[in-house]
Amino acid sequence: MSQAMQPGDEIPTIKITPDKYLTVRYAGASGDFNPIHIDDDFARRVGLPGKILHGLWTMAQVARAQTEAAGGPHALKRLHVTFRGMGVPEHEITVTGTVDRVDDGVAIVHAVAEQDGRAIIRNAEAELQLE
């Protein structure tokens, strides 16, 4: 899709359902062992619905949608997101995006990540170097 990106084009939608063990694996990879991510009981005691996804993992899914649309990770030059809600394991996340503009071989894509009908990341803006 990368060379054909035009303003108004939608990037391919990504849908992913994080399994119940994802937060533990991500904690090990990231070093973020905050108990809200790995301990259901603790998360509930502090008012959450259960353990929640790491925000940076969710952001990585937004980045993945951009890089797959642009032909690989080399294309992602910048990514900015606004975290708007907490994602939870075992519920599908959908990442969508629309090309805002293309100038001098660089596409600006606006994206959102939603779970259960609510944005968990919004106002995402990626700068993609087109081939």
List PLM regions with ranges.
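Alpha-helix boundary/interfacial micro-motifs
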Residues: 25, 36, 56-57, 72-73, ...
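Hydrophobic beta-strand-centered segment that forms part of the acyl-chain substrate-binding groove
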Residues: 46-99
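Hydrophobic residues in beta-strands and at strand termini
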Residues: 18, 83, 128-130
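Catalytic strand-loop segment that frames the active site of acyl-thioester-processing enzymes
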Residues: 1-51
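HotDog/MaoC-like acyl-thioester-processing domains
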Residues: 1-11, 87-131
